[in-house]
Amino acid sequence: MRTQEADNVGHGRQIAQTICVACHVVSRGQRVSPNSEAPPFPMIAETPGMTSIALTAALLTSHRLMPNIILEPDERRDVIAYILSLQ
């Protein structure tokens, strides 16, 4: 039986592979970044001190080069769970 956390990570991966992949490397197996200025998810995950709070703030803040992606709170939670699973 799958756990809720595994479901969240799986859903976050699905969102990342659908939306975020337009600019970011979203998995360790992806070699080419569509946008060289968009940090790869594995690099984001491995940033010292990276937490769900820091990722929430980043996703809710406008970035100069990042499109304003609107995620529902549960989608944002799941993308964050996926990113942190890459640690």
Regions found by a protein language model. Give the residues of each.
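A broad, low-specificity signal for short, low-complexity segments enriched in glycine/proline
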Residues: 2-6, 26-29, 40-43
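Short, non-ligating residues that shape and space the ligands of small metal-coordination modules
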Residues: 29-30, 50
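Electrostatic cytochrome c docking/interface patches
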Residues: 1-15
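Short, surface-exposed glycine/acidic/tryptophan-bearing loops
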Residues: 32-34
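Extracytoplasmic electron-transfer domains, predominantly the class I c-type cytochrome c fold
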Residues: 36-87
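The canonical Cys-X-X-Cys-His
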Residues: 12, 17-27, 79
